[in-house]
Design a protein with these regions (language model features):
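Secreted, periplasmic, or luminal enzymes acting at the cell surface/secretory milieu
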Residues: 1-15, 20-28, 32-41, 51-58, ...
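Hydrophobic helix-and-loop "lid/oligomerization" segment in the mid-to-C-terminal part
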Residues: 43-138
Length: 237
């Protein structure tokens, strides 16, 4: 298990949405409960710093050392599960500011690429509330979009990974290949980021999958996408 989101508390929120769960089960704790501590190796791989909503705080950990330790663990492991994505810090899934880009922050894309090179038997679990770029997608064995699942996130995630629960969710929006595939980036600066503090929503109703369908743009994952451990077929009752 590699990745800060395997251990980071993500159900807390902040400000008026702050929660204080009695116990939050992390993905790492969920995996240990299922497979036993003796079968799990863990390292951070990257670090985001303390939670903050007005500016980005450094983690205080050496990024290169975290990467090297992650590669060491990846070489020793039979299977790598990378728990990454976003969190609720500044310029991520946080109110008051846009994300800087669609890329995963803190060098995660580069780290995943390096992990795949030393252990191709790698799966990625993304914990986020929004779409991210996935340049490594074709090189991994599996992908799970985990969202923010609350205080029992670790148990739910581990149940799906070990096969005790069937993943049956469907995407509530389309995930584009790149940021420019979104309608807001088609009409120039007036639409995004705006002119003199004013944005014009020129895409009208052509947002999300409607935009992709109208402009014949293939998304990375379309609205309603979702795999499971079985197959389904529509037919007459």
């Amino acid at each position: 298990v590699i990745g800060e989101n395997a251990v980071k508390q993500l159900s807390l929120g902040g400000g008026s949405s702050e929660l204080k769960p009695q116990k939050e089960i992390s993905p790492l704790e969920g995996m240990i409960e299922k497979y036993g501590k003796e079968h799990i190796l863990f390292t951070l791989g990257y670090a985001s710093g303390e939670p903050n909503y007005s500016n980005e705080l450094p983690s205080g950990l050496d990024a290169d050392s975290l990467v090297q330790e992650a590669l060491k663990v990846a070489r020793e492991a039979d299977v790598v599960l990378f728990f990454g994505g976003l969190n609720k810090n500044f310029q991520q899934d946080c109110e008051g500011d846009d994300r800087r880009s669609m890329d995963l922050p803190f060098g995660q894309n580069e780290l995943i690429e390096k992990i795949i090179q030393v252990n191709p038997n790698t799966g990625v679990i993304l914990i986020s509330g929004n779409a991210v770029s996935m340049p490594w997608l074709s090189q991994i064995d599996g992908l799970m979009q985990s969202w923010y699942l609350g205080s029992q996130a670790g148990t739910a995630t581990a149940n799906i990974i070990c096969g005790e629960a069937n993943p049956s969710g469907k995407l509530p929006f389309s995930i584009p290949v790149k940021l420019e595939d979104n309608s807001a980036h088609y009409f120039g600066a007036e639409s995004y980021p705006g002119v003199n503090g004013t944005q014009y929503y020129k895409d009208d109703i052509l947002v999300g999958y409607r935009w992709h369908d109208t402009k014949k743009i293939d998304p990375l994952f379309p609205f309603g996408y979702g795999l499971s451990y079985t197959t389904f077929q529509y037919g007459k009752a």
